Amino acid sequence: MTTEHIEELNDQQIIRREKMAALAEQGIDPFGKRFERTANSAQLKEKYNDKDKEELNELNETAIIAGRLMTKRGKGKVGFAHIQDREGQIQIYVRKDAVGEENYEIFKKADLGDFLGIEGEIMRTDMGELSIKATHLTHLSKALRPLPEKFHGLTDVETIYRKRYLDLISNRESFERFVTRSKIISEIRRYLDGQGFLEVETPVLHNEAGGAAARPFITHHNAQNIDMVLRIATELHLKRLIVGGMERVYEIGRIFRNEGMDATHNPEFTSIEVYQAYADFQDIMDLTEGIIQHAAVSVNGDGPVNYQGTEIKINEPFKRVHMVDAIKEITGVDFWQDMSFEEAAALAQEKKVPLEKHFTEVGHVINAFFEEFVEETLIQPTFVYGHPVAVSPLAKKNPEDPRFTDRFELFIMTKEYANAFTELNDPIDQLSRFEAQAKAKELGDDEATGIDYDFVEALEYGMPPTGGLGIGIDRLVMLLTDVTTIRDVLLFPTMK
């Protein structure tokens, strides 16, 4: 360690380093070694919470725990402290005459943030708090920096996101939210595995962006001397696996989109995509409802979800409505009628709906109407289906009205949570859709994709009728944990 670095340290950091050196002089490794526990805080509370002081004295049972020192009080020959492990906190009671003078010195000199191992007897204090009366302490790791805001947790938002480890130490609600996130993902896996789906892994580096309308991150492969993109979706590779005969596949993984950031968008996020052979979008609606409800039950039980004061009836059948019907109900505009792009654009001008310069089809106008007037009204879980072909380059046309596709999106609290459709498996139609996307890209649509000829070739070998689905995991976790910003469900959100 350089002299320059030491001079930059504050008083607390200097004192902690001196204590570290003192431990080493006593033959104690300041950063410890393997330590075997017999229980954690939650297990002890579950086992002994119904026992009073006298019962615990009669039982005379012991335990070995370990964790971070979060509070410490007392003076002279007696002290109390709280030790925090993954499951929570438990109090320890330390007496000099019980642990010995040398062992008690370890406790006295321990700083908040240090890790300790404690062996002792299970007891209840006169105040009624379940505790461990220490018979031996082991120093496990020295914290060289003090913890933030000792009693009130971490409150600075910038620090919470940049230094998530400090947030997890000091904010139990935040810690539990990320435990819940893991449980949600595990339950989704369990549900799909139970339905006969196979979890697979596909490449993160792609030669061509595809499977979604989004701007990609571009990188370079030095050995091959080619530009590549980070995936904006897993769709096209997963559908290749359907061609290969896997029939039911899903992937949970990171997606990368070089776009703006807001309360519900992060450039790097987690999605799940699911593909089922011999199914259509109606089957996938049922599957989506099952996934969402199963995840909700694992967190909130079999009932509605409360999100920001609104009761979301996630436990009831989801509403289903065609996009055109939803627009007509709110605006009175009937897009079931045949009309030219110019006529549709005139309706948009009349209703003050902004149109992008690359819009060339009636379907673009229909989608713009939906985004302008309908999305903000969708509070309860609602499947909106029948998207126009112009905005659904990978979805199969509806056989009864080829202007529209067998596609749906799930909306809850005005936000999209899932996107799905009967997959386009006609390679000729697929190529023409790719060509239309390439043209839109030339006209200035940054989110339009190029032509994936290899995927078209795969379809030429034959893909069975297939239903596909994508769900944003982060938004789902936000809903089920009642938070309003995606940064609160990402352990390490993107920061400047």
From Swiss-Prot:
Its EC number is 6.1.1.6. Transmembrane segments: none annotated. GO terms for biological process: lysyl-tRNA aminoacylation. Mg(2+) 1 binds at residues 409, 416. Keywords: Aminoacyl-tRNA synthetase, ATP-binding, Cytoplasm, Ligase, Magnesium, Metal-binding, Nucleotide-binding, Protein biosynthesis. It is found in: Cytoplasm. It comes from the Bacteria. Its cofactor is Mg(2+). InterPro entries: Aa-tRNA-synt_II, aa-tRNA-synth_II, aa-tRNA-synth_II/BPL/LPL, Lys-tRNA-ligase_II, Lys-tRNA-ligase_II_N, Lys-tRNA-synth_II_C, NA-bd_OB-fold, NA-bd_OB_tRNA. One of its GO terms (cellular component) is cytosol. PROSITE patterns: AA_TRNA_LIGASE_II. Mg(2+) 2 binds at residue 416. It catalyses: tRNA(Lys) + L-lysine + ATP = L-lysyl-tRNA(Lys) + AMP + diphosphate. GO terms for molecular function: ATP binding; catalytic activity, acting on a protein; lysine-tRNA ligase activity; magnesium ion binding; transferase activity; tRNA binding. Binds 3 Mg(2+) ions per subunit. Homodimer. Belongs to the class-II aminoacyl-tRNA synthetase family. This is Lysine--tRNA ligase. It comes from Streptococcus sanguinis (strain SK36). The lineage of its organism: Bacteria, Bacillati, Bacillota, Bacilli, Lactobacillales. The gene is lysS.
